[in-house]
Amino acid sequence: MNITSPNICSGRSVRSWYPSALLVLLSGFAACPPVVGETLYTVRQSYVVKDLPEGAGQVRGWFWMPEDRPEQRMLEFRVVEAPESLKVTRDPRYGRSWLYAEGTAGVGKPLRIVTEFKVLRSKVSGLADADRAGELTAEDRRAFAEELRLDEKHMEVTPTIQKIADDLAGNEKNPVVQARKFFDYVIAKSDHYSKFGSTPQGKCWGSASECLLGTGDCCTDQHALFIALCRARGIPCRLIYGSRLNPKNEGKDHDPGYRCWPKFYAPGLGWVPLDVSSGDTAGDRAAEWFGGLDDGRLEWAEGRDFDLEPRSSVRPDLVIRGWVEVDGKPHSAFDRVVNFSRDESPSMSRVGAVATERASTQVAVIGK
């Protein structure tokens, strides 16, 4: 089994080819982040589908898998256990890799996938430099039309959101300056649930409108509002999904859940990451999360309204951890377990040795 990963600094896999493709590629290289810290993670991740309904037939599952991104470098990836049907697919809309497998209920073991991988995660800071950013052009907006959609579900640019964006940004043309205004606004307007408890009180639909009403308290709600505000001003913005790896859980079997964050595009900088929810809980250090991300997270997926490959019977708006269908109907009962160890001072010789091994065999199947 082989995977060709996107260039580490490209910021994405190629999913569309425009006459302006050179602009897309160069903008990605411009976004290669300045690293201020690195952590090497060794991770074991498993998925198992459970609680199948009586009389169930076909079981299909699409699950998150890691790959090279601007702030992370995959050094090794192994499939430890999986059905014979396992394959790596790419969704055509976002170009991201997924683990896909299918089987028949009641025949053999439950649908179970276990992987192990090593990933070098970078802490980045200071990427939102307004002095280096240029104004967005018509060419930029043509190239990134997908990230400028005004009608994307739960991130619609309504008249209310358009007015808020215009009132905040005024005549400002610099995308970084505008995005910072939106970042500060969402923090002032909303509260992430973790400020008050351990579980969200909202619906967690990733809804800009819910966030405005004060009933959306998840990271997806806060970032949906930020994205809608950016798009209202013609600033391309996209949604990224990952997981935070809390040092307190090192060596423990657990499900780390998910954390999303957006990236907006600025000429001269490329795609700039930020985390409104982390900023919201950081007090007077909120600004560190505008153009910066910690190395205590992994990136998995991107976008909404997923066109999975092979095509799912139901097209999901959000995919958190994975998507399972039983006889063509969504099935939410599956477990995800992660266990990780970390090295906060990885030696370059060690990383280089693993990377050399990876170059010869990117993905190995070591068990069934």
State where each predicted segment sits:
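Low-complexity, Gly/Ser/Thr/Pro-rich intrinsically disordered linker/tail segments
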Residues: W289, L293-K368
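N-terminal secretory signal peptides that target proteins for export/translocation
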Residues: M1-R15
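Intrinsically disordered, low-complexity N-terminal segments that are enriched in acidic
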Residues: P34-S125
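Solvent-exposed, acidic/flexible segments
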Residues: E54, H154, T158, E172-A179, ...
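Glycine-rich, acidic and aromatic/proline-enriched surface loops and short helix-turn segments
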Residues: K181-K195, L225-A228, A232, P267
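Bacterial N-terminal signal peptides
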Residues: Y18-A31
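Hydrophobic/aromatic-rich core segments of domains that either
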Residues: D221-S313
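Acidic low-complexity segments
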Residues: S10, D91, R112-Y193, P200-S209, ...
